[in-house]
């Protein structure tokens, strides 16, 4: 049985490894001239970020892999989690490569990303449905041993049956792309994700998912170390390489623990960002008017006069609160 010390050690190791990898990787990215292109229609304060090296997600991925594999607590679940993280990271890397090295601003087309992401998600869903003792069941937050409302009983788990695979695919793909949308301010995606990863590390540890607890702790440490280079003013951006990898990692943990329904709660910031984009597009197409000054949501607050650092800190704090709610939801 693992204890809190192992989680703490893993976070510290991941943090140190990232601090070591950063100075080794960032100068290399600068020499490759993989600078970020900033949208002209974005906040004017962001124009100074133009040319900042991107594809920094490789630092995160390498740190997570090294930290996880040196833990001595390796099993099939850990390999699955690492494989999914790397696979989503590769999709992001291809997208970044096309945009910043081949200089094609659009990168992968949306349908290409969705096909690749969906394929990984299908494999993950099939694996879990066939190997988990819960089969196609998922845990329902907030109900404990079950509750009855107006004569209708809601049980602790719900069996999705044939809907399991499409549902898991939807949640995984939605999570991955929501994290990608969140990565728009210095330190935002890394900070939000380290908090959520810490939440999963604690839950996984208390539920006996030893390898997943280590994996989540490795993500926490990697993101914490990455903030040294990614907090305002950022020396490097994680790019799609990092955001898709982190989104895939968080989604995979939730799938393997059968708690995918907790993601919209603890990952509320992720989904607020995604929903803001969806609502903005729908509103503009139907009425010609925009709901937000700019989407994703973090840009709306920037254009409303909030400093970039204020938006980031507030979103971090909201995520801490949501993770505390998540703890109650799974208790």
From Swiss-Prot:
Pathway: Cell wall biogenesis; peptidoglycan biosynthesis
EC identifiers of the protein: 2.7.8.13
GO molecular function, one term: phospho-N-acetylmuramoyl-pentapeptide-transferase activity
Transmembrane parts of this sequence: 7-27, 54-74, 78-98, 106-126, 133-153, 154-174, 195-215, 249-269, 311-331
Pfam families given in the database record: Glycos_transf_4
Protein name: Phospho-N-acetylmuramoyl-pentapeptide-transferase
Catalytic activity: UDP-N-acetyl-alpha-D-muramoyl-L-alanyl-gamma-D-glutamyl-meso-2,6-diaminopimeloyl-D-alanyl-D-alanine + di-trans,octa-cis-undecaprenyl phosphate = di-trans,octa-cis-undecaprenyl diphospho-N-acetyl-alpha-D-muramoyl-L-alanyl-D-glutamyl-meso-2,6-diaminopimeloyl-D-alanyl-D-alanine + UMP
Stored InterPro entries: Glycosyl_transferase_4, PNAcMuramoyl-5peptid_Trfase, PNAcMuramoyl-5peptid_Trfase_CS
Cofactor: Mg(2+)
Family affiliation: Belongs to the glycosyltransferase 4 family. MraY subfamily.
GO biological process: cell division; cell wall organization; peptidoglycan biosynthetic process; regulation of cell shape
Family annotation (HAMAP family): MraY
Membrane topology, record value: Multi-pass membrane protein
Keywords of this entry: Cell cycle, Cell division, Cell membrane, Cell shape, Cell wall biogenesis/degradation, Magnesium, Membrane, Metal-binding, Peptidoglycan synthesis, Transferase, Transmembrane, Transmembrane helix
Function in brief: Catalyzes the initial step of the lipid cycle reactions in the biosynthesis of the cell wall peptidoglycan: transfers peptidoglycan precursor phospho-MurNAc-pentapeptide from UDP-MurNAc-pentapeptide onto the lipid carrier undecaprenyl phosphate, yielding undecaprenyl-pyrophosphoryl-MurNAc-pentapeptide, known as lipid I.
Protein's cellular compartments: Cell membrane
Cellular component GO terms held in the UniProt record: plasma membrane
Keyword check for Thylakoid: no
């Amino acid at each position: 049985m693992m204890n809190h010390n192992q989680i703490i050690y893993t976070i510290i190791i991941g943090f140190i490894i990232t601090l070591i990898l950063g100075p080794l990787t960032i100068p290399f990215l600068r020499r490759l001239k993989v600078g970020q292109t900033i949208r002209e229609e974005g906040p004017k304060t962001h124009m100074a970020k133009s040319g900042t090296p991107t594809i920094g997600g490789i630092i995160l991925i390498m740190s997570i892999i090294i930290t996880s594999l040196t833990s001595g607590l390796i099993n099939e679940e850990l390999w699955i989690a690492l494989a999914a993280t790397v696979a989503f990271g590769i999709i992001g890397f291809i997208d970044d490569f096309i945009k910043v090295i081949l200089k094609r601003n659009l990168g992968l087309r949306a349908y290409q990303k969705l096909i690749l992401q969906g394929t990984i998600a299908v494999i993950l869903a099939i694996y879990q449905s066939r190997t988990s003792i819960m089969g196609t069941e998922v845990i329902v937050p907030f109900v404990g041993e079950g509750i009855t409302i107006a004569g209708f009983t809601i049980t602790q788990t719900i069996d999705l049956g044939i809907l399991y695979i499409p549902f898991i695919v939807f949640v995984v793909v939605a999570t991955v792309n929501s994290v990608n949308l969140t990565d728009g301010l210095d330190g935002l995606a890394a900070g939000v994700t380290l908090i959520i990863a810490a939440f999963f590390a604690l839950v996984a540890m208390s539920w006996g998912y030893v390898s997943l607890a280590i994996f989540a702790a490795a993500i926490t440490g990697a993101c914490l170390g990455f903030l040294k280079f990614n907090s305002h003013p950022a020396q490097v951006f994680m790019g799609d390489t990092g955001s898709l990898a982190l989104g895939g990692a968080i989604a995979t943990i939730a799938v393997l623990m059968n708690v995918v329904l907790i993601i919209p709660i603890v990952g509320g910031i992720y989904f607020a960002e995604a929903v803001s984009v969806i609502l903005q597009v729908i509103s503009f197409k139907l009425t010609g008017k925009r709901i937000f000054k700019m989407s994703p949501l973090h840009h709306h607050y920037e254009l409303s006069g909030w400093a970039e650092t204020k938006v980031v800190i507030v979103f971090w704090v909201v995520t801490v609160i949501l993770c505390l709610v998540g703890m109650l939801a799974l208790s």
